[in-house]
Regions:
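Conserved alpha/beta catalytic core and glycan-binding cleft of carbohydrate-active enzymes
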Residues: 130, 143-147, 151-230
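Substrate-binding/active-site clefts of carbohydrate-active enzymes
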Residues: 1-130, 135-162, 181
Length: 230
């Protein structure tokens, strides 16, 4: 269980917080704040981002629009299930959840309502926090239709690429999902999007660790990858 950690400090168990089970897409995690007062997480994060910018460091926000913390059809109801389950989630013909995320549910990203939610969220982080870009977790889900089938020209990806407010931020796709859709080198978006290249990462890391048998794959990954594959 990724939420548990057996390590202890002074007998107290430490708990991991990966931030990948989103409840509020517009809200920073309050557990990271230093202040004792409530509602300081936004102020502290803005201060951190400004300090990084002042030192020439860009801030790329890792966003997870492929699923939520509400789990599968037997999971808790926090928000979207109660608002309109049929709109916000991809449902099978028998009313269960498609699970292309590996987390129990899959956001219905190309429904107009969900598209608008994602667009407004990215605009919010761009305008209010001045982040420099976004890395989209399991981004192939962003290109699936309401029935789960891959789309050639997904409306959401096109909308984000063409939006004037997002025109100066980086858009980086982790171009696969847990449903087997692997799109590194063929992500269905314009040159506006870069791709997260998992093969490059894995093969080069393996080679640097001393796995000489992986030298060819590491060399191929370096020489064959284009500059838009991060």
């Amino acid at each position: 269980d990724e939420t548990m950690n057996s390590r202890t400090v002074d007998g107290k168990q430490l708990l991991e917080c990966w931030g990948y089970n989103t409840v509020g897409f517009f809200a920073p995690n309050s557990s990271y704040t230093a202040a004792n007062e409530h509602n300081q997480e936004g102020t502290e994060l803005k201060t951190l981002i400004k300090a990084l910018h002042d030192n020439g460091i860009e801030v790329i926000l890792d966003v997870v629009f492929n699923h939520t913390a509400e789990g599968n059809e037997k999971g808790n109801t926090f928000s979207f299930k109660g608002f309109d389950n049929n709109i916000y989630y991809m449902l099978t013909p028998d009313g269960n959840y498609y699970n292309f995320s590996g987390c129990g549910n899959t956001l219905n990203c190309n429904h107009p309502v969900v598209q608008q939610l994602i667009l407004e969220c990215l605009r919010y982080w761009t305008i209010n926090y001045r982040v420099d870009g976004f890395r989209f977790d399991l981004a192939s889900i962003l290109g699936r239709n309401e029935d789960g089938s891959p789309m050639n020209n997904p409306p959401l990806l096109r909308t984000l690429a063409d939006d004037s407010i997002l025109s100066n931020v980086k858009l980086i796709a982790e171009a696969w999902d847990a449903g087997g859709l692997y799109q590194v080198g063929s992500f269905p978006a314009s040159g506006r999007w870069a791709e997260w290249n998992g093969r490059y990462r894995d093969s080069l890391r393996s080679y640097l660790k001393g796995d000489s048998w992986n030298a060819w794959d590491a060399a191929w990954s370096i020489s064959a990858v284009s500059y838009t594959h991060l």
